[in-house]
Structure formats: C-alpha cells, structure tokens
Amino acid sequence: DTAKVKLLERLEGFAREEDPRVSQVMAHIAGSWEVVLVARADGHLAADVRPLVRVSVTVIMEEAGRREQGSAGGGGRYDYGFFSDERLHEYARAAVHQASVNLAAGPAPAGTMPVVLGPGWPGILLHEAIGHGLEGDFNRKGSSAFSGRIGQQVAARGVTVVDDGTLPDRRGSLSI
C-alpha cells in the first residue's frame, strides 16, 4: 500500500536528518483489523472493532570505525493515522539517541548481580515466562499449568501480577 510505504520513507528521512553518522535505517510497519462479535447463549450480543498498529525503526550509526545501533517505535489499538509526523520524529530521535549513547558507551559489567525491573516494557519478560500460561484459551482448554488454580497461590510470596484488560488503547485491552 502506497500510504504505508510513504510513512516508512518519512520515518527513514527523519532518522537520517537527526545525525550524519546514521549509515543505515530499517523501518517496519505492521497492522491488523479485527471485528469481534460475541453471542451469548441468552441472546445478548456485543461487538468490538480492534485495530492494532505498530511502527519500529532501527538505525545503525558509525563513527571512528565503530558501529552501533538504536531502535524505537510504538503503536497500539489505533489505525495508521496514529503515526503523525511528530510521532515519527519522536521515534527517529529516540533510535538515533540510543545509537549515539551506544557509540559512546564502554564495556558493560559482567557477572552475577541483582537486577531490578521497573514497570512498563520489562513486563514482556514476565509475559514470556508465565504469561502465555495465564491466557484464557489455554486455561479454558485445560492445557495450562495454571488451569483450575483460580484463588490459589501460583508464585512466591511477595509476587503480585495484575492483568488489567481495561487500560485504554493497549495491545491486550478489551472495550466490551
């Protein structure tokens, strides 16, 4: 689709304009559009339209024989109109900034050490570790290690996980 190609071309241009050390730009766009109809046995009907879009950009920067990368992106339960030029500029700036920081970075420390994860995207680690087993379809079919365990402790004391499908415009959000 021509509009999507133009969007990616704009994103590439914004990234290259940010810093002359940018030698490569890789941009990706993805989207889906679902129409969901739920029909209960009592005749109640509920419908939802669920768009989902995502754009990402990765840049390679080179300086003094060293090459580093940075990436950024975003999206959510929107249509492609979500990706304004201002938003695309933000993604390009963030990717270039990350690559620039990486160019100036020294070696990372190595070895065993404590790690503290804050809220937000680190939740992906949690999702990959246990999240798929918590998804409704696996539990409905009884194929999850968590099937039939509602109300029971399934993690170490002190671990609390809340899956909130009411957060607006997020990937796992529901509006019905």
Feature map (PLM): residue ranges:
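Active-site bordering "gate/hinge" segments
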Residues: D1-L174
